[in-house]
Amino acid sequence: MSAISHHSLSHLNSTVSKRLMPTYSDPVVRIAVLDTGFDGSHPDFSHPRTAYFTGPFSDLPQPEKDEEPQLTRIKAYHDFCQPSPPGDRQGPPPQPHSMVDLAGHGTAIAGLILRLAPRAELVIGRVCHGVDSNELSAPDPSRVAAAIRWAITQKVHIINLSLGYRNQPLKELLPLRAALLEAQRSNILVFASTSNQGSHEPAAWPASDARFAIGVHSCNDMGSAPSGSSCKASENGYNFMAVGENLLVHRLAQKGGGFELVSGSSFATPVVVSVAALVLAFVWQEECKRERDEVGREVMLEDLGSLGGMGRVLMALGEKTAGSYWAVGMKLFWAGYREGDGRDPEKEEKEARRWAWGVLRGAVAY
């Protein structure tokens, strides 16, 4: 078994545990995963999200304490591969047996977000059957467009698109372009994977165009270099990168369950989606009301719902590396923060929060 990537995600998880102070009265970030569906029968989803892995192969999940089962955070599901139209209202949460995933791609992506973004709610749109490799990476654009419009009715804040298009006639992409612009008008952030065609190929669309999505490349666990399969940096798009090599994700129950290793920009994308969700969760939490009111008088915090605004924040959290690629910081706002000596935890907590809001103010006001 290849070495499991743990460095980046360990930094992210420890930062969340130490710096975010969520309460159940805080607004909840809602994320749409539009992919191959979701395997609700996987036993791990009946437990709280994984805190860490143990065992001889480091693949035995140890759940977080005092958190709800992951399945309760799946709030809606619709199969766009079937002819039945989706409802335009939020209904009851889906039952595990009612959700389908034949490939495991969507389950892996949703599982990463459930693990990395505590309390975030998910809505799942199945937009590809997952039995054909070409359809998996580039499903019917009109189907994805319909799923985006459904996600808008589900009041999501972020959409994960681990898919993309190459050499597609513009006419075929027009419905999807329109849906992406509609999502922007609804202050919904869209993240898309750039693809894994290597440095001789450009990024897939919409990741290649900053007008439609925030593009994400895969990089190594240290965040120091893009993966060998990463396509070349886009001239007109964001070139964020996050760990996408040897990530441990849920394996379909029908294939034995448990976990397996995957690599690619498809899986780096939900890592960055989780970071964006954590940024929103931090800003919205009750603990930050005073800072939110103060900073909100100086800058437009609503810009966090725009591609440009969130893009600037993600740049502020990370650093430019390896040419035009930009590594997203797994320590969130606190990469350059100097820890106190622990003698006055309450004071240090306030100072850490003040530091974070300083970073945020500078990024949004740019």
Curated annotation (Swiss-Prot):
It is a single-pass membrane protein. One of its GO terms (cellular component) is membrane. Keywords: Hydrolase, Membrane, Protease, Serine protease, Transmembrane, Transmembrane helix. Residues 1-321 form the Peptidase S8 domain. Residues 83-96 have a biased composition (Pro residues). The active site is at D35, H105, S266. It is found in: Membrane. Its EC number is 3.4.21.-. GO terms for molecular function: serine-type endopeptidase activity. It is an enzyme of class 3 (hydrolase). The chain crosses the membrane at residues 261-283. Its main location: membrane. Signal peptide: none annotated. One of its GO terms (biological process) is proteolysis. The keyword Ubl conjugation does not apply. Serine protease involved in heterokaryon incompatibility, a process that ensures that during spontaneous vegetative cell fusion, only compatible cells from the same colony survive (non-self-recognition). In P.anserina, the het-q locus exists as 2 incompatible alleles, het-Q1 (AC B2AXJ5) and het-Q2 (this entry). Prevents cell fusion with strains containing the gasdermin-like protein het-Q1 by mediating proteolytic cleavage and maturation of het-Q1 during the allorecognition process, thereby triggering cell death. Belongs to the peptidase S8 family. This is Subtilisin-like protease het-Q2. It comes from Podospora anserina.
